[in-house]
């Protein structure tokens, strides 16, 4: 959501920034089973699923060298577009070559993206050029 809003603002105000996002799919790291809520109030069903599959079905995960490819594509390819989302191209975006991924419907709500930006500015005490600097 933040990447979408950054790209939108960059185009609107002429910042010259291309912003996109990427995800690694199912990759052999602990990213899916750790995080801000890990170990606090019990594991969610999704955390239990990831933990189970990571432990008992490691073949379902791609290695780190393949998992990083969507992020590398998004950051370095001249074909990567601002406002796009990249991930593995295979079934369910779990594994495969880097390709354009599906942006979740909830992440495409422009008013929510603007709100996230505003809250981020408020929480960090940072603002960026706005009106008057438009392209």
Show which residues each predicted segment covers.
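NAD(P)H-dependent oxidoreductase Rossmann-fold/reductase module
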Residues: 1-135
